Regions:
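Extended, subdomain-level signal for the structured scaffold at the beginning of enzyme domains
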Residues: 1-108, 116-120, 125-126, 138-148, ...
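Cytochrome P450 catalytic-domain "roof"
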Residues: 153
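Short, acidic/turn-prone active-site loops that include or flank metal/cofactor-
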Residues: 133-136
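Anionic-ligand binding patches
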Residues: 129
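Catalytic, metal-anchored helix/loop core of enzyme active sites in primary metabolism
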Residues: 112
Length: 194
């Protein structure tokens, strides 16, 4: 994505895209971050910059996974969608980075089916989390304390339920990175009742 003209922070977000990603989840969060002045890069884990969503919409990623250092980003974001979540889960660099961040206490956000990746890696053990209702059993099996809230924050792990909670997830990431005042401003800008 282009760098926001109102760049408000040095914080950066890596938005990971595999074929079959959920476009509302990925792009609504990207939009909220842009409005808040946070640079977010759409990063393809496929062998091409064109990535196709779970509903057949083609998106051009900013960067290829092979060309970035994920550890240089402030926050790693895993959108859901099927089979996109499976594509992210099958990407060794994603697994490695999620585990590194968990060990270092660095932020990871995941929505819909993607929290199941965190659960399978053991990152949600004893942590409060949420996911799409179809994946609640998977995160519970991974030791998560499951909630039905739209967004759940447990220290540096941020999880959300699905496409309908994407704006709220984006705002929670903004809160994590920039604070509540910016959240209120962005929420007003997207006419989100709070």
């Amino acid at each position: 994505m282009p760098t926001p003209e109102n760049l408000a922070t040095d914080a950066t977000v890596a938005i990971m895209l595999a074929d079959g990603f959920e476009e509302v989840e990925a792009l609504a969060v990207a939009d909220v971050l842009y409005r808040a002045g946070v640079r977010a890069d759409l990063i393809s884990v496929t062998d091409a910059r064109h990535v196709t969503s779970s509903h057949g919409i083609r998106v051009v990623a900013d960067l290829m996974l092979e060309d970035v250092d994920l550890s240089a980003y402030t926050l790693l974001f895993l959108p859901g969608g099927m089979p996109g979540t499976l594509g992210l889960k099958a990407t060794p660099a994603i697994q490695t980075e999620v585990l590194r961040r968990a060990d270092a206490g660095q932020p990871v956000a995941a929505i819909c089916a993607a929290p199941s990746i965190l659960a399978e890696l053991g990152v949600l053990e004893g942590r409060h989390a949420t996911a799409n209702p179809a994946f609640v059993k998977a995160i519970a099996a991974g030791g998560a304390i499951v909630h039905e809230n739209p967004v759940v924050v447990d220290e540096f792990i941020i999880t959300s339920r699905g496409a309908g909670t994407s704006l709220e997830l984006g705002l929670e990431i903004v809160r994590y990175l920039l604070g509540a005042e910016v959240v209120d401003e962005v929420a007003r800008g997207v006419v989100l009742a709070r």
